[in-house]
Amino acid sequence: MMNSANQAWTMYPGLSHGAYEALHAHGTDEQKALYLPKLTSGEWTGTMCLTEPHCGTDLGMLRTKAEPLADGTYKITGNKIFISAGEHAMAANIVHLVLARLPDAPKGSKGISLFVVPKFNVKADGSLGDRNPIYCSGLEHKMGIHGNATAQIAIDGAIGTLVGKPHKGLAAMFVMMNAARLGVGNQSLGLTEVAYQNALVYAKDRIQMRSLSGTKAKDKDADPIIVHPDVRKMLLTAKAYAEGARALQVFCTLLLDKAHSHPDEKVRADSDELVALLTPIVKAFVTDNGHIATNACMQVFGGHGFIKEWGMEQFVRDNRINMIYEGTNTIQSLDLLGRKVLGNQGATLKKFGKLVGQLVAEEGVNEKMAEFINPIAIL
């Protein structure tokens, strides 16, 4: 519902949640004590600082440097771009998670480390200290999500602390990235749902021409456009994508709960594997179809959909970024096939297939489910 109301604003708490997850999984006890309570309360917000002007998908090319200091901290220097929620005054502090290279780092992605670099340095007692030299050097002028401050970040010797092990930054950051990819799917679902609801109301109210099968609204000069086949097709397409995406998201959320909290270690491990398999599907499939759905819903409005005052074009503009950030959808396909399927010779895919087989067996005798189960059974 929050994404339906305002995707751009919802990104602020969403990124904070991702930063929390990364620090919770890989941070030291001291880092957890300093940052997690304030991230949880919303007093501080979080970001993920990956992209640089010359590298986005290929993070092995990043140039941001981390110089060790005598007290165990690091001096971070470099430039980042496209940093969502990168600068604002909504919170007392911004907790930046920054990818950088140590002096002895090997080339490529195996030489990347992760650092927590706060906007304001944090004292041992949790109070704020001096301003850290990590600044917003510019704001991006974007097609959509105008309500989110997408910043260019200049890091000029800011003080940071290492998260996880040296040169293992991508593994630590991917805790946040995977959470973000599931979140992006949820963003697209929210926009698909609100676009559908708006288009449905409009289609019931707007009258144009008569139905091909005869007059439906005898008391009016024309019939509501919802009676026309192409309008119904567009509405049903959007509805199907919204309901399907919601079911997939709920399924993944249940798997996440099992992965985190189930008492059986094997169930936890299997659930974690399945979430990893489905994450690129949630990110790419839901956002691709969300783009189709929001465009279709704007089309239902005809010329009015192209006018800003109706709000439909914003859903299309905002949804477009979901196919790009947190790993482009083409990258998701490579991740799915290369890592999640071929990486373990299809073992996880077979586990998913077993779940589908169980569903077919359990529901195959249910006549009311036949039209849904039969197509799955022949796959």
Located regions from the model:
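Extended amphipathic alpha-helical segments enriched in small hydrophobics
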Residues: 181-259, 345-379
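Internal helix-loop-helix
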Residues: 1-33, 37, 41-42, 85, ...
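A glycine-rich, basic-preceded beta-loop-alpha segment at the flavin cofactor/substrate interface
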Residues: 82, 121-137, 142, 149-180, ...
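A short core secondary-structure module
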Residues: 73, 77-131
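Alpha-helix capping/hinge segments and adjacent helical runs
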Residues: 145, 251, 273-351
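C-terminal helix-coil-helix/basic helical segment that borders enzyme active sites and/or dimer interfaces
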Residues: 243-283
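Glycine- and acidic
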Residues: 1-7, 16-21, 47-49, 77-83, ...
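Flexible, glycine/threonine-enriched loop-and-boundary segments that flank and lead into catalytic domains
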Residues: 47-88, 272-288, 292-309, 315
